[in-house]
């Protein structure tokens, strides 16, 4: 188990009926969240640069929310939020596990940024949504070649 679990972009914008990801992914994400103490779970929400800050972002329906540790990002990597970086450093985090969406987008960018920040990084594929499976093979190769611990299989 890593020091912190980062749940990336599990929000109604991306995970809902008719979207690329649905209830099966939410169930897998919830199962992973349940294995961590609530004070070790961090949620990342994406707010595009053009979106108004006063518009509340919503988690996907049914997501297990066990912590009030919620950080917004406006770019692909969650490490573009200095408050998240300060929180992790201030709490002595050495290792981070990532789950969420999309394996070729924000999860990929955040994982690679965490490696550059010298964290031990792991990803549980059973709780990662990937819209483009073919392209994801390149992502997996990049992760493994940078020392990311990859476990599980895409659901």
Would you name each region that the model predicts?
Residues 97-100, 118-133:
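A short glycine-rich beta-strand->turn/loop micro-motif centered on a GG-aromatic cluster
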């Amino acid at each position: 188990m890593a020091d912190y679990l980062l749940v990336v972009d599990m929000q109604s914008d991306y995970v809902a009926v008719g979207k690329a990801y649905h209830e099966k992914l939410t169930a897998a994400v919830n199962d992973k969240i349940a294995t961590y103490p609530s004070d070790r779970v961090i949620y990342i929400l994406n707010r595009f640069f053009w979106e108004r800050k006063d518009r509340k972002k919503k988690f996907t329906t049914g997501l297990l929310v066990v912590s009030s540790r919620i950080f917004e990002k406006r770019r692909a990597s969650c490490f573009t939020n200095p408050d998240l970086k300060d929180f992790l450093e201030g709490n002595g985090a050495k290792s981070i596990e990532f789950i969420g969406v999309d394996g070729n987008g924000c999860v990929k960018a955040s994982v690679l940024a965490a490696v550059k920040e010298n964290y031990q990084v792991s990803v549980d594929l059973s709780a990662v949504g990937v819209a483009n499976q073919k392209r994801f093979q390149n992502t997996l190769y990049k992760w493994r070649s940078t020392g990311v611990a990859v476990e599980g299989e895409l659901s």
